[in-house]
């Protein structure tokens, strides 16, 4: 499930390093975390929706790859991201 354009803009604004920053790993992780949270809520109602569950696993995998990249580049940014978004690792 996607997120509304207004919500996505809000997430980008709160996670951006500078104005107009939409591609940094921090912003991408924030957007993916929002989409993952939406899908998790969706699965509480629609437990047998296995097609969307596959999409969720792809999102989680993509987020993990981005987090691995951030961890490799800067451990402090990585830990801040985990804490900010409440990601267990």
From Swiss-Prot:
It holds the Pfam family Ribosomal_S15. Residues 1-25 are annotated as: Disordered. GO terms for biological process: translation. Residues 1-11 have a biased composition (Basic and acidic residues). GO terms for cellular component: cytosolic small ribosomal subunit. GO terms for molecular function: rRNA binding; structural constituent of ribosome. Keywords: Ribonucleoprotein, Ribosomal protein, RNA-binding, rRNA-binding. SMART domains: Ribosomal_S15. Part of the 30S ribosomal subunit. Forms a bridge to the 50S subunit in the 70S ribosome, contacting the 23S rRNA. PANTHER family: RIBOSOMAL PROTEIN S15, BACTERIAL AND ORGANELLAR, SMALL RIBOSOMAL SUBUNIT PROTEIN US15M. One of the primary rRNA binding proteins, it binds directly to 16S rRNA where it helps nucleate assembly of the platform of the 30S subunit by binding and bridging several RNA helices of the 16S rRNA. Forms an intersubunit bridge (bridge B4) with the 23S rRNA of the 50S subunit in the ribosome. Belongs to the universal ribosomal protein uS15 family. NCBIfam families: S15_bact (TIGR00952). This is Small ribosomal subunit protein uS15. The gene is rpsO.
């Amino acid at each position: 499930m996607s997120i509304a354009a207004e919500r996505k803009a809000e997430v980008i604004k709160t996670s951006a390093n500078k104005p107009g920053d939409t591609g940094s790993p921090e912003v991408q992780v924030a957007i993916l975390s929002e989409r993952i949270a939406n899908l998790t809520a969706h699965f509480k109602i629609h437990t047998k929706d296995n097609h969307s569950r596959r999409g969720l696993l792809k999102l989680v995998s993509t987020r993990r790859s981005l987090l691995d990249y951030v961890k490799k580049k800067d451990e402090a940014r990585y830990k801040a991201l985990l804490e900010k978004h409440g990601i267990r690792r």
